[in-house]
Amino acid sequence: MIEPLTHTALDGTAHGFFTRQGGVSTDLYESLNVGLGSDDAHSRVLENRDRVRQYLSATALVTAYQTHSTVTAFVDTPKEAIKADALVTKTRGLAIGALAADCAPVLLADAENGIIGAAHSGWRGAF
């Protein structure tokens, strides 16, 4: 079962800081690996991504091909392999995410304007 960390500052916005629990990946990638660029079995990654998507009640989940940059991409439809370290959308039902290991994931929400953001804040892009 997926049980992400959430924060009251984002109440009213479907969100979560997902841990490794609740997925189907094994061995090195155990368990909730959602990284399309990993060497994990593609079918497992897709199942994990679908579990996150369902948790968020989203129609699609978009993550970037993170490059440790300051590049931000605006996403209005499901896409893959966008080279960026931050994603922004105002499309209802579209979940966006930032993957992190030793970097910081940052979630942003502007409820008044219906805009959300997800950023991968690494040493190069944060400074």
Q: Where in this protein do the model-derived segments appear?
A:
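Short, His- and charge-rich active-site/binding loops that engage polyanionic ligands
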Residues: 30-43
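Short glycine- and Lys/Arg-enriched binding-loop motifs that mark or flank ligand-binding interfaces
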Residues: 19, 31, 118
